[in-house]
Amino acid sequence: MNYIISFKNLILTVVLLIFTVHGSSAEKSIALGYEPKYDTGFVHFDYVDPTSTKKGTIRLSAFGTFESLNPFLLKSLAPAGLNDLVFETLMERSLDEPSSSYGHIASGYNLANDGLSVTYYIKDNATFSNGDSITSSDVLFSYSTLISEVAHPQYRIYWADIKSVKILDEKSIKFIFKRKNPELHMIIGDIPIFSRKWLEGKEFDQTILEKPIASGPYIIDSFEPGRYITYKRNQNYWAIEEPTRVGMYNFDYIKFKYYKDMTVGLEAFKAGEYDYIFENHSKRWARDYSGPNFVNGSIKKLQLKHDNNAGIQGFIFNTRKEIFQNKKVREAITYAFDFKWSNQNLFYNQYQRCTSFFSNSELSANIKPSDNERKLAKKLSIPEKKVINKNLSFIN
C-alpha cells in the first residue's frame, strides 16, 4: 500500500511539474536590456484602438511585379503584404519599445540557466488557416526549410548560432545553441511558421502559386501575378482575441495594385485608383500633388508628425581613403556644403538638417547638451564650451 501511495504521489508530482513548465514558469515576454513595458496579462498594445470596427476595403499600391507566393526565396519576388498579413511568428514584436517581444503563436519560453538553449511552448488554440493545430513539428519543419540551401541565405545567417532542435512533445520545442548569444532566444521567436501541407509535392525553390497555409489574420482571396493581389480577413482567425492582435487588422479586404513606376502610380492615385500614398521625394511632393481631386477635397494632402526614427541622409566620408582620414579636411568639406541654399533651391524647403544618426528619436543628439551630459562633462573636467561646440559643429 505504501508503494502504491508513493507511486501516486510521484505521478502527481510529475504532472504538476509538467504543468508548471508549460504554464506559470514560462516567460511571456523578452526585452533586451530593460524591463518590458507590458505586464503579463496585458489586454492590448497601447498604440491600437480595441474598439475599432472591422469592415471595409483599403486599396494600396505596389511597384514592380511579383511572380511567386513564396516570400522566403532570394531569386523570386513575392507580393506586397504577404509576410505581414499571412505569416506569423512565435513571438510578436511591440512597436513602442526598442526591442521587445511578446508571446503570440508561443505562449512563452524558458531560457536555460546556462544560456545555451531555449524551449518554446505553443499555444493550444493556435491554428493554421485550414484549421489544423500548430504543433512543434510545424515549427521544426518551418525552421529546417528556412535554413536549407534553397531558402534565402539571410535565414541561415540569422540563426547561425543554433546547433540543433529537439521536439519535446506536440507543443514544446527546444533550440540548442552553439555558444552563448544574448539575442538568440529572441530572434528564434521571429521564425515564420507555415504548414508542411502547403509544400507537399512541391520544390521549395520553384515558383509556387498555391495559396500559403499559415496562421495570419488574412488569407489570399485572389491574385494575378504582376497585376494585383487581394487579401481577405480570415473570419476564423485563431488570434482575434489575443492581446498581440486586439485592435489590429481591421479591414475586411486589403488590395495591392501593381504599377511599373512611381510616375504611373502617382497618376493612378490622383485618378482615384487607390486610397493612400506615402511620399518621400521632395520634388514630387512640392510639384506633383495637385489636380481636381485635391481642389474638391476628394484627396487630402497631409504632413503628419510622427515619432519614428527618421534615420539620416547625407554625404558619408570613406575614412579608409587617406584624404578623408584628416579630421580637418572632413570638417572643411562639411562647412563648404551650403545646406540652406540647397534646401531652398533643390529641396523646396522640405528638409531639416540632420543632427544625429538617430534623427527624430529619443536616441538623437540634441543641439544643446542635456543635464546628464553637463554632469558627465563636469565629472570628466571637460569645459562646457567644448561640449556645446562639439554638438554645434555637426550642423553648422
Question: What are the roles of these predicted feature ranges?
Answer:
Residues 325-396:
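Append "and occasionally in soluble cytosolic enzymes with long acidic Gly/Pro-rich linkers
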Residues 26-114, 121, 144, 213:
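N-terminal lobe/hinge region of extracytoplasmic solute-binding protein
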Residues 121, 155-200, 217-224, 374:
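Surface-exposed binding/hinge segments that line
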Residues 38, 48-53, 75-82, 108-152, ...:
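Aromatic- and charge-enriched surface segment that lines or borders ligand/interaction sites
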Residues 27-29, 55-64, 107, 117-120, ...:
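Short, well-ordered beta-strand elements
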Residues 164-167, 221-232, 257-321, 332, ...:
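Extracellular/periplasmic solute-recognition and catalytic clefts
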